């Protein structure tokens, strides 16, 4: 019986670790302005971005990256545009309360986002940083 309880406890602990690992990450606020956000790239991570009606949000990747594809679930409630240079794009919500996912592919990495329009706490820019050895 003790062995069975130990197994159940270990299984529960392992499943909690998996759910935490799959959680979305909100990019951290910059030191000077909370609207400037920073996210460390992690393969397979989903990043949460908050947008606001009437405002654009930029997403900036490493200077050596070129965007090859931006795919969004809802292309009616959000507008997307490339930024010259190819390592950034902007998004702007057109519908209040809209939410979608966006997958971005570059010549080096893949990025996954959950984006929502909210009247509070809009991000002006999300800038990615890269761990050593990730090619960034």
What are these regions, as identified by a protein language model?
Residues 1-8:
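Bacterial N-terminal signal peptides that target proteins for export
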Residues 13-20:
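C-terminal segment of classical bacterial N-terminal signal peptides
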Residues 21-136:
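A general "mature secreted/periplasmic domain" signal
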